[in-house]
Amino acid sequence: MVMEKPSPLLVGREFVRQYYTLLNQAPDMLHRFYGKNSSYVHGGLDSNGKPADAVYGQKEIHRKVMSQNFTNCHTKIRHVDAHATLNDGVVVQVMGLLSNNNQALRRFMQTFVLAPEGSVANKFYVHNDIFRYQDEVFGGFVTEPQEESEEEVEEPEERQQTPEVVPDDSGTFYDQAVVSNDMEEHLEEPVAEPEPDPEPEPEQEPVSEIQEEKPEPVLEETVPEDAQKSSSPAPADIAQTVQEDLRTFSWASVTSKNLPPSGAVPVTGIPPHVVKVPASQPRPESKPESQIPPQRPQRDQRVREQRINIPPQRGPRPIREAGEQGDIEPRRMVRHPDSHQLFIGNLPHEVDKSELKDFFQSYGNVVELRINSGGKLPNFGFVVFDDSEPVQKVLSNRPIMFRGEVRLNVEEKKTRAAREGDRRDNRLRGPGGPRGGLGGGMRGPPRGGMVQKPGFGVGRGLAPRQ
């Protein structure tokens, strides 16, 4: 029976899932995805302030990866593209966010070129790997808070725990046959069914081991589940077809034999499996811990300076600021009556202005929209309508659900006098709330309750590697 080659997209998705799992659990094994002629570029600048040069070969790539100090990395994959390229290779482009050592998530883009390994059909290694952080290219510090994105990041990571890394020094390769779509719903790109591009199954282990694992057709457990998650029916059909034809090469069958009952994947003695795909290096998203700390304080310092300088600016030049562009202060919209404006809080950190504007356009004509993404998280913003009627319509329809799942904090825009009055009241009340009224016993619990955020931080990631 002739095996049908998986589509490039299925290969790309499976590779991305396996690669980023390894980045989280055993970054010291990443070099096995590469070969002696592989090149690796991981953003950043050298000591002279120039873009860092690429490194070549497994040894240098391993040294470079270890210099990044990847610890407890978390990755949120937003989009994966994959196309067939020369000599039966596959080009994979990944866009998402990466957090290193529980720092804020940073947007990144990574491109892999997967080349056939040659010794076995449907085996690939990473020939080229280019990684860049978005803030390094466009400036600014584009981040998302680790707490908010934790839920999305955690779920894929739990799925990714199943892949086991093969400790072969010969190089880690990716098995195309085992194409299970364990990525988040974000990865719902349509799969081009016609493309029969060879997408190797990343079986890093010796051929003998692969043959031993062939008997168990476990693909059905992983692929159908993933196919359902993919919004486009085409990927689901392809995934099912590949599963039926390639059951003997199922990555799941390999891992099911070696994984402990709990499903935890050992970091060091990783059982042989086809997970070692040389294509994805989301780890790069998380810059070395040594680099991140200096940047965050600078950003926090800038934010503090802005907050300190803003109050005096509001009074003297409200009209000038109304025309300025920026995401920090709402005073730019002073030229519009307060009755035409709405304050919007709890905005998703990746929200786009055009998307938000289209959402509120259903209530009335939006003449201006601003999002504050440079201060404390989560983001907030202001929407300005050409009339007060849309404002009242929005307020009467509260709660406002954005994307059907995010509840926005929508309030009337307060005048400066009202805001200052609220601040004075808060200062007089203090952190414990108004004195008198409620008994002392009532003040303690609320404060304690506000400290802990159930759902965030719980299971934030795997335990740090020993």
UniProtKB/Swiss-Prot annotation:
<dbReference type="InterPro" id="IPR035979">
    <property type="entry name" value="RBD_domain_sf"/>
</dbReference>
<feature type="modified residue" description="Omega-N-methylarginine; alternate">
    <location>
        <position position="435"/>
    </location>
</feature>
<keyword id="KW-0391">Immunity</keyword>
<dbReference type="GO" id="GO:0033677">
    <property type="term" value="F:DNA/RNA helicase activity"/>
</dbReference>
<feature type="domain" description="NTF2">
    <location>
        <begin position="11"/>
        <end position="133"/>
    </location>
</feature>
<dbReference type="InterPro" id="IPR034374">
    <property type="entry name" value="G3BP1_RRM"/>
</dbReference>
<keyword id="KW-0399">Innate immunity</keyword>
<dbReference type="GO" id="GO:0043024">
    <property type="term" value="F:ribosomal small subunit binding"/>
</dbReference>
<feature type="compositionally biased region" description="Basic and acidic residues">
    <location>
        <begin position="413"/>
        <end position="428"/>
    </location>
</feature>
<feature type="cross-link" description="Glycyl lysine isopeptide (Lys-Gly) (interchain with G-Cter in ubiquitin)">
    <location>
        <position position="64"/>
    </location>
</feature>
<dbReference type="GO" id="GO:0005634">
    <property type="term" value="C:nucleus"/>
</dbReference>
<feature type="modified residue" description="Omega-N-methylarginine; alternate">
    <location>
        <position position="447"/>
    </location>
</feature>
<keyword id="KW-0540">Nuclease</keyword>
<dbReference type="GO" id="GO:0043204">
    <property type="term" value="C:perikaryon"/>
</dbReference>
<feature type="region of interest" description="Disordered">
    <location>
        <begin position="413"/>
        <end position="466"/>
    </location>
</feature>
<keyword id="KW-0963">Cytoplasm</keyword>
<feature type="compositionally biased region" description="Basic and acidic residues">
    <location>
        <begin position="318"/>
        <end position="329"/>
    </location>
</feature>
<feature type="modified residue" description="Phosphoserine">
    <location>
        <position position="373"/>
    </location>
</feature>
<dbReference type="GO" id="GO:0005829">
    <property type="term" value="C:cytosol"/>
</dbReference>
<feature type="modified residue" description="Phosphothreonine">
    <location>
        <position position="143"/>
    </location>
</feature>
<feature type="region of interest" description="RG-rich region">
    <location>
        <begin position="410"/>
        <end position="466"/>
    </location>
</feature>
<dbReference type="InterPro" id="IPR012677">
    <property type="entry name" value="Nucleotide-bd_a/b_plait_sf"/>
</dbReference>
<feature type="region of interest" description="Acidic disordered region">
    <location>
        <begin position="142"/>
        <end position="225"/>
    </location>
</feature>
<dbReference type="GO" id="GO:0003729">
    <property type="term" value="F:mRNA binding"/>
</dbReference>
<feature type="compositionally biased region" description="Basic and acidic residues">
    <location>
        <begin position="297"/>
        <end position="307"/>
    </location>
</feature>
<feature type="modified residue" description="Omega-N-methylarginine; alternate">
    <location>
        <position position="460"/>
    </location>
</feature>
<feature type="region of interest" description="Disordered">
    <location>
        <begin position="255"/>
        <end position="329"/>
    </location>
</feature>
<comment type="function">
    <text>Protein involved in various processes, such as stress granule formation and innate immunity. Plays an essential role in stress granule formation. Stress granules are membraneless compartments that store mRNAs and proteins, such as stalled translation pre-initiation complexes, in response to stress. Promotes formation of stress granules phase-separated membraneless compartment by undergoing liquid-liquid phase separation (LLPS) upon unfolded RNA-binding: functions as a molecular switch that triggers RNA-dependent LLPS in response to a rise in intracellular free RNA concentrations.</text>
</comment>
<dbReference type="GO" id="GO:0003678">
    <property type="term" value="F:DNA helicase activity"/>
</dbReference>
<protein>
    <recommendedName>
        <fullName>Ras GTPase-activating protein-binding protein 1</fullName>
        <ecNumber>3.6.4.12</ecNumber>
        <ecNumber>3.6.4.13</ecNumber>
    </recommendedName>
</protein>
<feature type="modified residue" description="Phosphoserine">
    <location>
        <position position="250"/>
    </location>
</feature>
<keyword id="KW-0347">Helicase</keyword>
<feature type="cross-link" description="Glycyl lysine isopeptide (Lys-Gly) (interchain with G-Cter in ubiquitin)">
    <location>
        <position position="353"/>
    </location>
</feature>
<dbReference type="GO" id="GO:0140693">
    <property type="term" value="F:molecular condensate scaffold activity"/>
</dbReference>
<dbReference type="InterPro" id="IPR000504">
    <property type="entry name" value="RRM_dom"/>
</dbReference>
<dbReference type="GO" id="GO:0005524">
    <property type="term" value="F:ATP binding"/>
</dbReference>
<keyword id="KW-0238">DNA-binding</keyword>
<keyword id="KW-0488">Methylation</keyword>
<dbReference type="Pfam" id="PF00076">
    <property type="entry name" value="RRM_1"/>
</dbReference>
<feature type="modified residue" description="Dimethylated arginine; alternate">
    <location>
        <position position="460"/>
    </location>
</feature>
<keyword id="KW-0067">ATP-binding</keyword>
<feature type="domain" description="RRM">
    <location>
        <begin position="340"/>
        <end position="415"/>
    </location>
</feature>
